[in-house]
Amino acid sequence: MAKNLRAKIPAADTLIVRDINEDAMKRFANEAQEAARSNGAGANEGKVEFAKNAREVAEKSTVMVTSLPESQHVIDVYHSILKHGALPSLELERLFIDTSTIDPTTSKDIANAIHTTQTGRFVDAPVSGGVVGARAGTLSFMFGASSQSEELLERIRGVLALMGKTAWHLGEPGAGVSGKLANNYILALNNIATAEAMNLGVRWGLEPKALADMINSSTGRCWPSEVNNPVPGVVETAPASRGYEGGFGVSLMHKDLRLALAAAEQSGTPLALGAQAREVYKDVEEKHRGKDFSVVYKWLTEQSG
C-alpha cells in the first residue's frame, strides 16, 4: 500500500513512514527513490522520510494511515499519539485511517477518543484483496465514518483510491470493521469447504484441475476455489503452488474468525458453523504456522492418511 501511496501522491509531497522493522523502511525508501528517478523526478520530489514513532508521523501529516496485526497494537499506537496532548494545528482536519482488521468495539472507542479530543477524524477502513491486490493497487476497502459531511466522505475515498480500486462506505464508525469481519467469516468457511470438496474429489479419483474448472463454472464457485485454490498446481499463482508460502496467513484468518465470533456473541447473533471452523483453524495454525490459510487442504490430507 505504501508503494502505491508514494507513486500516486503529488511528487512534491513527502511520505512519512514508521515501521518496527527498520530494514523494511530503508528498503522501501530505496525502492521509492529509484522509482522516482526512473520517472524523471527532481531532487526534492518523491521523498520518503522516516519517523521515530507514531506521534511524530501524526505531527507531520495531514493524513495518517495505520495497518497493524491486532487490536492491542492499534490501541497502543493511538494512545501514544493522544497521551502527549494536542497536535500542531492544520488548515485541514487530520485524517486517521486505520486499515487493520480489529474488533468493532475497540475501533469505536478509538474513534471516540480521537473525536472528543478534537485531534482529527478517525476512519476504520479494513482492506480486502491480499498481497496481490496491495501490489497491484486493486484492493477493496470497506470504511466506517460519519456520514454528516459528503465532503469528508469524498476526501476519504480520494485517499483510499491511492491504494485500491473500490471503497464502500458502510456507515458510522465501526461499520467498516464489522463489514470486514462478516466478509472474512464467509471466507473462512468457504476455504474449509473448498479444501474438503477438493480432497473429496481427489480421493474419488478426479483430476484436481478438471474438478476445479467444473466448480468454477458452477454454483460452487468462490474465491478459494478460483483464485486461491488449495490444491498444489491447480492455480499457478496460488500459495498452494509454492508450498503455501506468502498469501494470507492461517494465523490471521484464525484471528479474524475469533473476532467475528466474539462480535457475534456480543450482539447475540447465532453462528451455526463458527465454533467448528474456529477449532479447525486453531489446529491448522498449530501444525502449519506461517503458511497461507489454504494450507487447510494439506491438513485435511494429513487427517485422511
Q: Model regions: which residues?
A:
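Helical "substrate-binding/catalytic lid" subdomain
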Residues: A175-V296, L300-Q303
